[in-house]
């Protein structure tokens, strides 16, 4: 049990490594910001469509058949999008980055910091939700077969490094504090060992493929919405459009290679 929990903790703390990479730079240039956010978009879109959502389809079709399970996965996916969209609309206009400003530069700087803060917190929340069932899955793999669990944990750790960057970059820009940015990045990853512990104590006797599949589908929807509504527009608005797109492609490539390494 300690071995399984240790593997899960290792994978979760990798977000802190990503945060450390993001805050190690002395200044955050527009190019670095655009590239990092674009990279994060690539990571989140690829992992959502290639790993999380197909996993939801597999879980749900195994219970409700091809048609019923597919419908459930699609509903869960768009349900996740609707949930985060509603939360976004409930944010007061004064701090909502989607509301245009009619005031000058000082307010624009204030709105930029608010946008970055909101983006970082929402990204941390989405990653934490994603890491919760992921941690439980890593823990179960560690309990069942250590030879399978080790490459799974390493692959998840590789995934978590760019996710830590996704959290730390906007929060460093918003707060000006490397310590806070690194703390949030690390905290989002600690959802992984928390998922392992809570899952072992409470969920394991009750959770079934239906709940797990719907959870995966909704998390994929949340991550896609954040990517296209928050991360990508901010990356492009930096004025470094091509840098953002190159970062996006690089993020997808890193995720693809990390998945292929452990097939």
Swiss-Prot record:
Record key words, sorted: Cell membrane, Ion transport, Iron, Membrane, Metal-binding, Transmembrane, Transmembrane helix, Transport, Zinc, Zinc transport
Pfam family for this entry, one: Zip
InterPro entries assigned: ZIP, Zn_transptr_ZupT
Membrane-spanning intervals of the chain: 1-21, 37-57, 68-88, 116-136, 138-158, 184-204, 206-226, 243-263
Bilayer topology annotation: Multi-pass membrane protein
Binding site for Fe(2+): 131, 134, 160, 163, 192
Keyword Transmembrane on entry: yes
Gene Ontology CC terms, in alphabetical order: plasma membrane
Cellular compartments annotated: Cell membrane
Superkingdom of this protein's organism: Bacteria
Function, in words: Mediates zinc uptake. May also transport other divalent cations.
Assigned protein family: Belongs to the ZIP transporter (TC 2.A.5) family. ZupT subfamily.
Protein name: Zinc transporter ZupT
UniProt source species: Corynebacterium glutamicum (strain ATCC 13032 / DSM 20300 / JCM 1318 / BCRC 11384 / CCUG 27702 / LMG 3730 / NBRC 12168 / NCIMB 10025 / NRRL B-2784 / 534)
């Amino acid at each position: 049990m300690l071995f399984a929990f240790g593997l899960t903790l290792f994978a979760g703390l990798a977000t802190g490594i990503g945060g450390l990479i993001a805050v190690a730079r002395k200044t955050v240039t527009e190019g670095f910001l655009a590239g990092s956010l674009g990279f994060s978009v690539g990571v989140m879109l690829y992992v959502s469509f290639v790993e999380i959502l197909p996993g939801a389809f597999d879980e749900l079709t195994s219970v409700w058949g091809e048609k019923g399970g597919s419908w459930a996965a699609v509903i869960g996916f768009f349900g996740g999008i609707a949930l985060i969209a509603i939360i976004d609309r409930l944010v007061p206009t004064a701090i909502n980055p989607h509301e245009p400003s009619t005031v000058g530069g000082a307010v624009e700087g204030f709105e930029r910091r608010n946008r970055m803060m909101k983006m970082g917190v929402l990204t941390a929340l989405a990653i934490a939700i994603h890491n919760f069932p992921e941690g439980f899955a890593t823990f179960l793999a560690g309990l069942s077969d250590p030879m399978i669990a080790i490459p799974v944990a390493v692959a998840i750790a590789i995934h978590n490094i760019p996710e830590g960057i996704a959290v730390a970059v906007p929060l460093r820009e918003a707060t000006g504090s490397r310590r806070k940015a690194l703390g949030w990045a690390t905290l989002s990853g600690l959802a992984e060992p928390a998922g392992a512990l809570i899952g072992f104590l409470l969920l394991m006797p009750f959770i079934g493929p239906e709940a797990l599949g719907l959870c995966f589908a909704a998390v994929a929807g949340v991550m896609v919405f954040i990517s296209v509504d928050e991360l990508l527009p901010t990356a492009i608005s930096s004025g470094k459009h091509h840098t953002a797109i190159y970062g996006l492609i690089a993020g997808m490539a890193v995720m693809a290679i990390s998945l292929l390494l452990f097939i």
